[in-house]
């Protein structure tokens, strides 16, 4: 008997395999619009997609493309992986030390509005290129920026629903360790996040009603 699929894991490869098992009939990712160096696939047993894109290609076979304007026809793929940047700052925290390491690894946007607009536009583009019932796998992370709490996974879900997706599933990737700067300990006002999310969105007209809006 197959092992029960859980919603949490310390291993993102396990999460991706679980998503493919539950939600992608052929078990394959067709397109990765933010491929980077292929960390989801290298040595994991997960088959790399045929279509690999990145704004700044770093690996062989990756084409230069913006996730908001992909060189794909409408309704041409069945499953897309999207792992966008999650940082946005102009502050001193990313100019040296741990902050600079994070910047080099993950990329950074100038402000939260630009970052989240990128998310929304990329979601719309994913909806354009996915076939009916196609799957968008969206990795995202909440964070604190300039003392404010940004629940990005909530924003992502809301934008996906507006674009025409159904939130079919969500997985939580747990971390045992995080890069932490001294100033983050000295000035801590919020819990340090040791998790991120893998949303599973299906291109579908299915809608969920959580409450009756009519007055009674």
Question: What do these predicted regions represent?
Answer:
Residues 1-216:
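Class I S-adenosyl-L-methionine-dependent methyltransferase catalytic core
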């Amino acid at each position: 008997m197959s092992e029960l699929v859980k919603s949490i894991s310390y291993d993102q490869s396990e999460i991706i395999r679980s998503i493919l098992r539950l939600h992608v009939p052929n078990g394959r990712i067709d397109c990765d619009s933010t491929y980077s160096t292929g960390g989801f696939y290298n040595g994991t047993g997960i088959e790399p997609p045929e279509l690999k894109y990145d704004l700044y290609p770093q690996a062989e076979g990756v084409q230069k493309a913006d996730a908001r304007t992909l060189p794909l026809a409408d309704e041409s793929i069945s499953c897309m992986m999207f792992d966008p940047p999650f940082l946005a700052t102009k502050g001193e925290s990313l100019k040296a030390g741990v902050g600079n390491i994070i910047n080099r690894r993950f990329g950074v946007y100038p402000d939260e509005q630009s970052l989240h607009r990128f998310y929304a536009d990329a979601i719309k583009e994913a909806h354009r290129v996915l076939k009916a019932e196609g799957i968008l796998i969206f990795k995202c992370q909440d964070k604190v920026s300039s003392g404010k709490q940004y629940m990005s996974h909530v924003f992502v879900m809301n934008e996906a629903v507006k674009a025409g997706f159904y939130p079919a599933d969500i997985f939580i990737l747990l971390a045992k360790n995080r890069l932490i700067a001294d100033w983050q300990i000295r000035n801590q006002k919020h819990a340090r996040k040791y998790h991120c999310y893998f949303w599973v969105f299906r291109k579908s007209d299915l809608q969920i009603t959580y409450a009756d809006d009519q007055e009674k």
